[in-house]
C-alpha cells in the first residue's frame, strides 16, 4: 500500500456520504429490486414448508431497504405465517435508519425484528460460544463479504446455519464488472487496512465449489455514472472517487502517478463506456444462491 493513503472505512461519516452518493448515481438498488420482483419468489418457494415460523437472518443489512422488499416476498408466499427477522449490522447509524424504516412500513404485523449491533464475525463468535445454533430458512449477505477477514470460514459457518430447504443468498460485484480489473491491478497499492478485501463473486463461486456446496448464480446488469470523478474540485466527484478506490480523500492524498493511472483506467473500456458525454462504470453484480446440505 502507498504510504499516506487511509481506508475510506476509517472515516465512517465520509464512507456513509460516499455510499449514499454511489446509490444515487448507480442502478445498484434498482437491479436488486428487479431481481427480488422477478426471481426471488421462485428461490423462496419452499423455504417455509409446514413451518409455523419462518426464520430469516440478514448479515450487514444496512438501513433495511432491500431487506423489507425481500420480507414482503416471503409474506406474499406464506401469508399469515410469522416471520422472525434477525439483523446483524455493525453500524449503529444504519440500525437506527432500519428501525425508522420499519416504524413507517405497513403490513409488518406478522414480522418480529431483532437487531444485533455486531459484525458478522462477532455474531459467529457469540453463537459458537453460546452453543445455541438457530437454523434459518433464509439468510442473506448483500455486498458485505468484502468486510470479513476469513471469507471461506464465514461462508462455511453461515451455510451451516441453514435449515432444511433453507437458502443462503449472496450479492457481490461480478467478476466481469469494472471493479474486478481495478482491484486486480491496484489492490496492493490501495489501503486494505484489514478493513476491506477485494473479492468478487467469481472468487466466492470458487470457494463454494471447493467446499462441495450446491449453488446457482445470476448476473445482474448495473451501471454507475462516474462523470463527475473527472472534474477536479467537484465534491461529489471526489466522494465517488473515494468510494471507487475505498480511499479517504483519494485525489488529494494519492501519489500523482497512481492517481493519474487510476483515473485513466476508470475511463478505459475494461471499466466503463462513454455514452452521450457521460462516463458509465460497469457495476454489474452477481447473485449466488446456496442450497442447504
UniProtKB/Swiss-Prot annotation:
Keyword Glycoprotein recorded: no
Record InterPro entries: HHMT-like, SAM-dependent_MTases_sf
UniProt GO molecular function: histamine N-methyltransferase activity
GO cellular component: cytoplasm
Binding site for substrate: 28, 283
Source organism, top-level taxon: Eukaryota
GO BP, one annotated term: methylation
Residues noted as binding S-adenosyl-L-methionine in the record, renumbered to the chain: 60, 89, 94, 120, 142
SUPFAM superfamilies: S-adenosyl-L-methionine-dependent methyltransferases (SSF53335)
Listed EC numbers: 2.1.1.8
Top EC class, one word: transferase
Compartments in which it is found: Cytoplasm
Keyword field: Cytoplasm, Methyltransferase, S-adenosyl-L-methionine, Transferase
Catalytic activity: histamine + S-adenosyl-L-methionine = N(tau)-methylhistamine + S-adenosyl-L-homocysteine + H(+)
CDD domains to which the protein is assigned, alphabetical: AdoMet_MTases
Protein's job: Inactivates histamine by N-methylation. Plays an important role in degrading histamine and in regulating the airway response to histamine.
Subunit record text: Monomer.
Annotated family: Belongs to the class I-like SAM-binding methyltransferase superfamily. HNMT family.
Protein name: Histamine N-methyltransferase B
Organism: Xenopus laevis
